[in-house]
């Protein structure tokens, strides 16, 4: 199992030509869950002019749905979906609430506003890649731990669990196909003076940094 989705649920708000746009984003794992979220937002913002939506569900993005909710056809839901697709996201639902401010945006303006709202939300909330990785427990001295950060930075890794006793025990998770190479690199980095123990597999969320 491996897919990209948003880091967490969240929302952002911006004003465009006196209209207020609020993008609500949520992780969902079924069409039913997505529609329940959309309905909840519509209920919360029942006075809004529009509550447009888009969602993608499935490890392989099998289900895709959009709604313009009264905006001109193709100016809201599809552009919103396009942002999710461009970031290769799935298991996510976005609803953009619009409170009309009196100035019409035109078709092009609406497309930019709705897509831009979702793009801003994705950027602010962040993206993670959910995957199965292999765990490696590392036992080292406190002196070695002082240098350990350099290894993590060099290999773009993050320590997930660390215990401090008379020594330092920490766990990292790496892609399965590079586990043995990572262990070899650790042994070389510490000149062979380190104890490594395989910890099996687990599902982890790896941050994806947008350029």
Placement of each model-derived feature along the sequence:
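Active-site beta-strand/loop microenvironment that shapes enzyme catalytic pockets
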Residues: 76-124
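A common structural junction motif
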Residues: 45-48, 155-160, 187-195
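C-terminal regulatory domains involved in ligand/effector binding and gene-expression control
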Residues: 1-74, 179, 195-206, 211
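Hydrophobic side chains in well-ordered alpha-helices
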Residues: 34-37, 114, 148-151, 182-185
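Signal for well-folded cores of large energy- and translation-related assemblies
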Residues: 42, 84-85, 115, 119-126, ...
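Short glycine-/aliphatic-rich beta-strand segments at the starts of folded cytosolic domains
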Residues: 126-143
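Short amphipathic alpha-helix segments
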Residues: 139-157
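Terminal, non-globular segments
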Residues: 172-178
């Amino acid at each position: 199992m491996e897919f990209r989705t948003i880091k967490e649920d969240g929302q952002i708000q911006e004003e465009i030509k006196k209209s207020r746009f609020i993008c609500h984003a949520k992780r969902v794992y079924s069409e039913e869950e997505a529609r329940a979220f959309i309905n909840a937002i519509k209920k919360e913002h029942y006075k809004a002019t529009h509550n447009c939506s888009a969602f993608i569900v499935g490890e392989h993005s099998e289900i895709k749905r959009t709604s313009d909710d009264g905006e001109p056809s193709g100016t809201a839901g599809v552009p919103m979906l396009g942002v999710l697709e461009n970031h290769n996201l799935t298991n996510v639902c976005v609803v953009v609430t619009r409170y009309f401010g009196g100035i019409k945006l035109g078709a092009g303006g609406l497309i930019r506003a709705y897509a831009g709202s979702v793009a801003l939300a994705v950027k602010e909330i962040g993206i993670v890649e959910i995957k199965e990785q292999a765990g490696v427990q590392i036992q080292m001295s406190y002196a070695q731990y002082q240098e350990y950060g350099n290894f993590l930075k060099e290999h773009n890794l993050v320590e997930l669990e660390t215990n401090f006793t008379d020594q330092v025990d920490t766990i990292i998770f790496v892609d399965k196909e590079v586990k043995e190479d990572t262990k070899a690199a650790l042994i070389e980095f510490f000149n062979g003076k380190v104890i490594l123990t395989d910890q099996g597999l687990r599902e982890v969320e790896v941050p994806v940094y947008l350029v």
